[in-house]
Every structure is written in C-alpha cells, then in structure tokens.
C-alpha cells in the first residue's frame, strides 16, 4: 500500500484508483499513513479526499473512471509503472462497400495507416474515448503509398458519407449506437477541430478487447472509387 501511495500524488480521485471508499476499517492504509511524515500525510489525505475537479479535459474524464479500471492497471498507475497520456487511436480504410469496418482483426499496425493491431489495445493499456474524428479524402491511386499520402478533409463534400451512420463498440457493448455522420460536419464551427465529435458520455476500452467502429452508407452514388476514410478516437490512455 505504501509504495502505491507514493506513486499516486499526480492524480485526482485516487480513492477510486486505489479501490478505497474511506479510512474506516482499512488497516493497511491507516498503517501506511502513520509511517509518513506529517506533511506528506496531510498531502496524501488531501488527495484521497479530492473529487478530481483540478484536472481538465480528457484526463479529468479518465480520473472519473478510475473505479472501472482493471486491478492490474490500477496497481501499475499507483506504483508509477503506468502513466496517463493523450492519444489518438487512428485507422484509414477504403470506401469499397456500403459497410466500412475501421478496425478489423486482420489489421497490422503500420505508420500512416493505423496505430493498433488486430483491433485491440496492447496489454496494460486502457483507453478512455473522449471524442471521435471522421474525415474523408480521395487517394491519387490505390497503391499503399498514395493512400498514406491522401489529404483528408471535411465530410461536407462527401454527401453519401455525411448521410450515413456510424457506431462504436467494445467487447460487443455499445459506446456509441447508430448515429448520423452529420455530427462530424464541423466546417462552420470555428471552435471545434475539423470532423470532431465530442462524446457527452466517454467510455473505457480495455486492453486485449475487440473494438469495432463501423460506418454504414445508404448509397455510394457519386463517390470516387478511391475514396478513403480516416477515423481517430481521441482520449486518454495508460502507457509506460
């Protein structure tokens, strides 16, 4: 317990991180507190009582979900073996049919195409999805190098995509149910990144669990056969 207490000071809501609701009956925690010098004891007690109001953005959202983290990740965060970091989990896929699966089990991690393999996070990584970016572009041709060099932009010029739907799941559980792609039309919103949809209900994706982001189109009429989609899941992740 003492080694965990020494590693959690950078976080808010550490009571949830450590899996404790209070001091009563927690002899291990009380013993660790007694062994601290008075200044450190006061600082630790203050952190234990914190509601997480100091942190902002995706990090604050992650701290609110500490109680949902697996025990091994909680322990590694407490010991300082894992930290919280900003990230975007991304993937590029061709619009070759009305159903586009942005993360698939046969995918390999490759710079410029995607940064996860097999549609799963690596071991010891938990990821809180705070927002989603969806962009479209037309590659010069269908070779991998040209696809990687595609300039992705707003969906407004791709009406069949705008009028389609998307869903996001993890371990077969809905994070975002079928929702109109119109939410990614942000060209006229000067305070919102291009193609960014902020989730009002952020959700965790756990390590080694299948994640599925599916784009469904009603029609492909008018789309260039070289059209590709870029999706980015923005949020906070645990990392060494």
What are these regions (language model features)?
Residues 1-240:
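Beta-strand-centric surfaces of beta-sandwich/beta-rich domains
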């Amino acid at each position: 317990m003492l080694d965990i207490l020494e590693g959690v000071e950078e976080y808010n809501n550490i009571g949830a991180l450590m899996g404790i609701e209070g001091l009563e009956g927690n002899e291990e925690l009380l013993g660790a507190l007694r062994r601290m010098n008075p200044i450190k004891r006061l600082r630790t007690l203050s952190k234990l009582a914190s509601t997480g109001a100091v942190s902002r953005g995706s990090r604050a959202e992650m701290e609110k979900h500490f109680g949902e983290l697996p025990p091994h990740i909680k322990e590694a965060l407490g010991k300082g073996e894992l930290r919280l970091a900003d990230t975007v989990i991304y993937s590029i896929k061709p619009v070759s049919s009305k159903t586009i699966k942005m993360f698939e089990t046969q995918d390999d991690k490759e710079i410029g195409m995607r940064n996860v393999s097999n549609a799963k996070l690596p071991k010891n990584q938990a990821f809180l999805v705070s927002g989603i970016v969806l962009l479209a572009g037309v590659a010069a041709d269908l070779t991998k190098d040209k696809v990687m060099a595609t300039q992705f932009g707003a969906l407004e010029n791709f009406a069949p995509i705008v009028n389609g739907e998307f869903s996001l799941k993890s371990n077969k559980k809905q994070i975002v149910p079928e929702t109109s792609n119109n939410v990614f039309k942000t060209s006229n919103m000067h305070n919102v990144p291009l193609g960014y949809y902020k989730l009002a209900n952020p959700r965790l994706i756990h390590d080694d669990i299948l994640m599925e982001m599916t784009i469904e189109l009603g029609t492909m009429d008018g789309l260039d056969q070289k059209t590709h989609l870029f999706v980015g899941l923005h949020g906070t992740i645990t990392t060494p």
